[in-house]
């Protein structure tokens, strides 16, 4: 059993046995009913990527390709334009969060990255002084929230640190998330930001180090309890999945493409489970 599978089962068990029910929930199911959830607070996980620990479960298939494309949309294209996400990457699941008929998700995610020139500033800081302690990506922009409607960012802050170990530089990352749908999005979000960590490390020719993941509200929606029990019953696959970025060290961050990533040794348990998402 991989570390990700162990933590997945532990979190499901903890939510189902110790979690409390939400009240006055904002999300709705497609039938219009309120999407309440059972949740715990303050969930934390640590993975040492340099030792082959990756935050992806084998208990069900995780659609990692589309998740990584979303990261490119946010941090390379730096846009909130759904046409770009749909046409360039073939990813459509954000369409449910379109604001009005604007063709965008509002001033969120990529729009905030572009507004503050976040990636270029981050890369410059790391180039000038890899050991500085100010390498922060923050998508929590109150001014942007007042400017337009739109879903507030769930994965809203990422921090980076560099360590020298036996003469080699390792890039660590910490992802902070205000809210996470445990069964559907947990490993998608984690692997997205591992991909971002790998892109930044490759830009400098560094190795990837540790990935820390903190979630304030970790939940299972009340229409997913049956799927939660099914996942607890499943025995994990014997594979040991790893995400690989097949570009030379020193490849510019903006020259990396989604197809440069490969998920190897991944043989998840099937069949896939169906989820009615909360919007």
Curated annotation (Swiss-Prot):
Record's keyword terms, sorted: Cytoplasm, Methyltransferase, Nucleotide biosynthesis, Transferase
Reactions the enzyme catalyzes: dUMP + (6R)-5,10-methylene-5,6,7,8-tetrahydrofolate = 7,8-dihydrofolate + dTMP
Protein localization: Cytoplasm
GO CC annotation: cytosol
One annotated GO biological process: dTTP biosynthetic process
Stored CDD domains: TS_Pyrimidine_HMase (cd00351)
Protein's pathway: Pyrimidine metabolism; dTTP biosynthesis
EC numbers: 2.1.1.45
Domain of life: Bacteria
Disulphide connectivity of cysteines: none
Active-site residues annotated for this sequence: 154
Residues where dUMP binds: 133-134, 178-181, 189, 219-221
Gene Ontology MF terms: thymidylate synthase activity
Bilayer-crossing regions: none
Gene3D superfamilies per record: Thymidylate synthase/dCMP hydroxymethylase domain
Pfam families: Thymidylat_synt
Record: residues binding (6R)-5,10-methylene-5,6,7,8-tetrahydrofolate: 181, 278
NCBIfam families named among the record's database cross-references: PRK01827.1-1
Subunit structure: Homodimer.
Function, in words: Catalyzes the reductive methylation of 2'-deoxyuridine-5'-monophosphate (dUMP) to 2'-deoxythymidine-5'-monophosphate (dTMP) while utilizing 5,10-methylenetetrahydrofolate (mTHF) as the methyl donor and reductant in the reaction, yielding dihydrofolate (DHF) as a by-product. This enzymatic reaction provides an intracellular de novo source of dTMP, an essential precursor for DNA biosynthesis.
Protein name: Thymidylate synthase
Organism whose genome encodes this protein: Streptococcus agalactiae serotype Ia (strain ATCC 27591 / A909 / CDC SS700)
